[in-house]
């Protein structure tokens, strides 16, 4: 029987009553002491990647069962209603906001607070948060630092993609950018004529180098670097990892160029099966004393989202390493950054994470979601009634495990909107 979400037959809907809370998943990866040899276009024996390719195929087959429902607006709407109903953390965001005086309580806020509470970082008092708007990570770090760590101050800088068109809105839903402009590194398109114009796009090598420089000029040392970037892939979830390769490389490179020795890193990823992703994790393993692949409980188990966490940075880039990696971003190709055959033990640990997070937990919950759809697509209210007791258990357990305390008014972030709470 599964350690994650499970169900069985019995009474007509007894399988709903047996849903159990997920655990925070944390898989450690071994540090690599041998020299790092970066390559412009590394080759990898196909046999090394076989099981990762099989994992990708297996997960995509399960994801594809939902594809026909996405083709019709009516069935797509019903599917999202069902998936929303089985979100065990729906409603928790407002509870956290009102009970603990929290700000910008989004799903991102819950995930970051959980990561901070679980990973035991040595210092989070100075942070660079990339791909950040609307600001859930910054708000969670601020809340944690003042209520759990009791730092006298929290210093931060941040960046996000600034839309190229004046008609596109910056995702500053809470006014965190508007009210704290000096903390932000990206610039409006109106400033394009400036020599150091930077719109925050981390797929551009010159932007990455400039963001890292600006961050370290404004804030030294940087104890924590976070990046929560992800491209909207529409309904094409089977290519989610592939379509995000360059973005995830750029946000990681920005962090490695700016994070101080002894610092910690949190990076969003999705599945971990592509050769380039595997090679990027191999690169990380040379720079951090501890490296983990994680899945917070508040990260929806039906999605592929993962967070790579590095603790205690041991060394900075050499000039040659910086040059090679920036050049790869500028002239991007998705071949591995290193010879993967040199990292067999690390790849075994990564594959264990793939099995645990995606082949077990995600597939099981996707199947659970489809079963709920078949039984309740026209009975959403009934589904909510059945799951209400379980949701309370999940949410109460989360609050106990994550040690929430009230944020004093004097420590709140400055926001420029009357709506400073959560997104339901």
UniProtKB/Swiss-Prot annotation:
Signal peptide: none annotated. GO terms for molecular function: mRNA (nucleoside-2'-O-)-methyltransferase activity. GO terms for biological process: 7-methylguanosine mRNA capping; methylation. Pfam families: FtsJ. Keywords: Early protein, Methyltransferase, S-adenosyl-L-methionine, Transferase, Virion. InterPro entries: Adrift-typ_MeTrfase, mRNA_Cap_2O-Ribose_MeTrfase, RNA_MeTrfase_FtsJ_dom, SAM-dependent_MTases_sf. The active site is at 268 (proton acceptor). It is found in: Virion. GO terms for cellular component: virion component. Induction: Expressed in the early phase of the viral replicative cycle. Its EC number is 2.1.1.-. S-adenosyl-L-methionine binds at residues 135, 228. It is an enzyme of class 2 (transferase). Residues 103-315 form the Adrift-type SAM-dependent 2'-O-MTase domain. PANTHER family: CAP-SPECIFIC MRNA (NUCLEOSIDE-2'-O-)-METHYLTRANSFERASE 1-RELATED (PTHR16121). This is Probable methyltransferase EP424R. It comes from African swine fever virus (isolate Pig/Kenya/KEN-50/1950). The lineage of its organism: Viruses, Varidnaviria, Bamfordvirae, Nucleocytoviricota, Pokkesviricetes.
């Amino acid at each position: 029987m599964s350690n994650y979400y499970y169900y069985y037959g019995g009474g007509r809907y007894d399988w709903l009553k047996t849903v159990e809370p997920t655990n925070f998943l944390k898989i450690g990866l071994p540090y690599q002491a041998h020299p790092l040899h970066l390559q412009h276009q590394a080759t990898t024996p196909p046999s090394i990647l076989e099981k990762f390719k099989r994992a990708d195929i297996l997960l995509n087959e399960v994801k594809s069962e939902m594809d026909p429902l996405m083709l019709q607006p009516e069935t797509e709407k019903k599917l999202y209603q069902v998936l929303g109903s089985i979100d065990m953390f729906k409603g928790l965001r407002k509870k956290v906001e009102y009970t603990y005086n929290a700000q910008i309580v989004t799903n991102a806020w819950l995930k970051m607070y959980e990561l901070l509470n679980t990973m035991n970082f040595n210092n989070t008092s100075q942070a660079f948060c990339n791909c950040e708007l609307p600001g859930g990570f910054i708000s969670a770090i601020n809340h944690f630092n003042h209520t759990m760590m009791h730092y006298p101050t929290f210093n931060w800088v941040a960046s996000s993609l600034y839309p190229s068109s004046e008609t596109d809105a910056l995702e500053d839903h809470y006014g965190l950018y508007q009210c704290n402009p000096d903390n932000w590194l990206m610039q409006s398109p109106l400033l394009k004529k400036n020599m150091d114009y930077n719109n925050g796009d981390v797929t551009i090598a010159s932007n990455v180098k400039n963001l890292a420089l600006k961050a370290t000029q404004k804030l030294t040392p940087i104890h924590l670097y976070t990046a929560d970037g992800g491209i909207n892939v529409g309904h094409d979830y089977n290519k989610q990892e592939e379509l995000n390769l360059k973005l995830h490389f750029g946000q990681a490179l920005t962090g490695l160029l700016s994070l101080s020795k002894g610092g910690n890193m949190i990076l969003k990823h999705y599945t971990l099966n592509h050769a380039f992703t595997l090679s990027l994790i191999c690169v990380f393993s040379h720079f951090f004393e501890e490296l983990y692949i994680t899945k917070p409980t508040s990260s929806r188990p039906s999605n592929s989202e993962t967070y790579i966490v590095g603790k205690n940075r041991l060394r900075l880039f050499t000039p040659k390493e910086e040059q090679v990696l920036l050049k790869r971003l500028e002239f991007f190709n998705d071949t591995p950054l290193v010879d993967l055959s040199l990292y067999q033990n690390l790849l075994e640990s990564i594959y264990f994470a793939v099995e645990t997070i995606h082949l077990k937990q995600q597939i099981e919950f996707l199947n659970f979601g489809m079963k709920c759809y078949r039984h309740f697509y026209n009975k959403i209210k009934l589904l909510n009634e059945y799951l209400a007791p379980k949701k309370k258990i999940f949410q109460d357990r989360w609050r106990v495990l994550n040690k929430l305390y009230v944020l004093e008014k004097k420590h709140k972030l400055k926001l420029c909107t009357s709506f400073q709470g959560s997104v339901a």
